[in-house]
A protein has these predicted regions:
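Hydrophobic, aromatic-rich cap/lid helix
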Residues: 167-192, 210
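Conserved alpha/beta-hydrolase "acid-adjacent" motif
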Residues: 212-217
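Conserved hydrolase catalytic core segment
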Residues: 85-122
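Short beta-strand/loop motif that positions the catalytic acidic residue
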Residues: 199, 205-207
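Conserved HGGG/HGGXW glycine-rich cap/lid loop of the alpha/beta-hydrolase fold
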Residues: 6-62
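Catalytic histidine-centered segment of alpha/beta-hydrolase-like enzymes
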Residues: 233-247
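Active-site loop/oxyanion-hole signature of alpha/beta-hydrolase fold enzymes
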Residues: 51-90, 94, 250
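Short beta-to-alpha linker loops that shape the active-site pocket of alpha/beta-hydrolase fold enzymes
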Residues: 54-59, 119, 234-236
Length: 264
């Protein structure tokens, strides 16, 4: 892995692969720089030089404890600054918040931005948050993950059972301690869509047609951002890059490269 040092002093690691214009990927919670993009990264590598950042507690990145979402936005911005060219930026879930905040810090370095379902900081009710806190402190990471997916994201029991039986589940549970810190940082995050009214970078806001729309800030951001529109992913929920990778990658590439195609 490659490494940089963030303004906070934390060591941040990332993978680089592929060839083409720079595309920075910022993963969400309950995943890392590998698992979040496992099925779409090989597709992206045919069109882009892919920089997959490992957020705090993943890969060889420092596992800090009391960091904020703004700290992680600074990590993303530091990676972008190190690349030496303007980049395309894609963030998923928690990673979408970090990507958006990073873009606001250095808008001149971001060509276009893709945000897939950034959750409201209040996504978890006080009751569910308290239960997850107790499970985390007890080290019961499997129950912690189950509670998040079923009671937080409202994943149906049948779908959750299928997820737990798949080879995707073990990495999800393994990431739970880092995700616990993510959820704490998100809950403290002062997120107000209207703060981004002056951000003129073109933004595509992705949302799955099967996702509980009220959990995500997609519509509020579409109303606040001056150059943004929503693209729905038919039949998908929160993990479209895993459940429909070809469709997902085509949606992203079409948006990012449309001006390049017109210029050609």
């Amino acid at each position: 892995m490659h490494r940089i040092v963030s303004p906070s002093g934390a060591t941040i690691s990332y993978d680089r692969s592929g060839r083409g214009p720079a595309l920075v990927l910022v993963h969400g919670a309950f995943s890392d720089h590998h698992t979040n993009w496992e099925f779409v990264r090989p597709i992206f590598e045919n069109q882009f030089t892919v920089y997959a950042i490992a957020r705090r507690g993943r890969g060889e990145t420092d596992a800090t404890v009391a960091h904020s979402l703004k700290d992680e936005a600074s990590d993303v911005a530091a990676l972008i600054e190190s690349i030496g060219e303007r980049v395309f930026l894609l963030g998923h879930s928690y990673g979408a918040h970090a990507a958006l905040a990073a873009t606001a810090k250095i808008p001149h370095r971001v060509r276009k931005l893709v945000l897939y379902e950034p959750a409201w900081p209040t996504i978890l009710s006080k009751r569910i948050a308290a239960r997850m806190e107790s499970l985390a402190l007890a080290g019961d990471w499997e129950s912690f993950a189950i509670t998040f997916f079923h009671d937080g994201l409202f994943v149906p029991l049948k779908d959750l059972a299928e997820l737990r039986a798949s080879n995707l589940w073990a990495p999800i549970v393994a990431d739970a301690p880092a995700s616990f810190r993510d959820l704490r940082a998100l809950a403290r995050h002062d997120f107000r869509p209207e703060h981004f009214r002056g951000l003129t970078v073109p933004v595509m806001l992705q949302i799955g047609t099967e996702s509980p729309r009220h959990l995500y800030a997609t519509d509020a951001l579409a109303a606040a951002l001056p150059d943004a529109w929503i693209v729905s992913l038919p039949g998908q929920a929160h993990e479209g890059m895993t459940t429909a990778p070809q469709m997902y990658a085509e949606s992203v590439s079409r948006f990012l490269l449309e001006d390049v195609a017109l210029a050609a």
